[in-house]
């Protein structure tokens, strides 16, 4: 039986699927968990986890529940910022904050996550400011 165009559209991953996949990847990396380990915890291969994270395959509600349990978060975690993201996409380009791709790439890198984890543990605002100044200084010497 041939499927209609609307059926194909419903099954095709969309921006929300990509966002959920991105949040799965972020949380998994935050937990220092491999794709293989997450896959084993939810009963799929690491390739399937990869497809979820890239937004290639949709994550069903039951599977999302399993993922949230394995990653120790509520299912709503994967939808956080979805509304804000959609709203920001609707704004004109002049109103959007443009984050350079290399910054985004660093933030989701292993080193970026380690740095963010360590920095988030520093409670004293003055110490945080000094760390920022130090990193800026070190970066200036690299140029």
UniProtKB/Swiss-Prot annotation:
Q: Where are the transmembrane segments?
A: none
DNA-binding region per UniProt? 35-54
GO molecular function, a single term: DNA binding
Q: Where is the HTH cro/C1-type domain?
A: 24-78
- Cystine links in this protein are none
Question: What keywords is this UniProt entry annotated with?
Answer: DNA-binding, Plasmid, Transcription, Transcription regulation
Which PROSITE patterns does the record cross-reference, listed alphabetically? HTH_CROC1 (PS50943)
Q: What is this protein called?
A: Uncharacterized HTH-type transcriptional regulator y4wC
Q: Which organism is it from?
A: Sinorhizobium fredii (strain NBRC 101917 / NGR234)
